[in-house]
Amino acid sequence: MPKQKTHRASAKRFKRTGSGGLKRFRAFTSHRFHGKTKKQRRHLRKAGMVHAGDFKRIKAMVTGL
């Protein structure tokens, strides 16, 4: 059976944490900030963690991490 290849787009979007989780970046951060409050913009700066329901599927895509 051939080796599973890393999904390159996913590898660029997710990073492995020290405890084995996957860190992700927030959506809605590229433009149109005038419609968002200061609090929304501040919270969008922080990275989030991948939810448990998505973890198994994403982990299979980013085999190299």
UniProtKB/Swiss-Prot annotation:
Give the start-end ranges of region Disordered: 1-20
Which PROSITE patterns does the entry link to? RIBOSOMAL_L35
Where is the sequence biased in composition, kind Basic residues? Answer: 1-16
Could you tell me the superkingdom of the organism this chain comes from?
A: Bacteria
What Pfam families would the database entry show? Ribosomal_L35p (PF01632)
Q: Which residues form a coiled coil?
A: none
The biological process GO terms on file are: translation
Q: Which family does it belong to?
A: Belongs to the bacterial ribosomal protein bL35 family.
Q: Which HAMAP family match?
A: Ribosomal_bL35
Q: Which PANTHER family does the entry link to?
A: 54S RIBOSOMAL PROTEIN BL35M, LARGE RIBOSOMAL SUBUNIT PROTEIN BL35M
Question: What name goes with this protein?
Answer: Large ribosomal subunit protein bL35
Query: Which organism does this record belong to?
Result: Streptococcus equi subsp. zooepidemicus (strain MGCS10565)
Record lineage: Bacteria, Bacillati, Bacillota, Bacilli, Lactobacillales
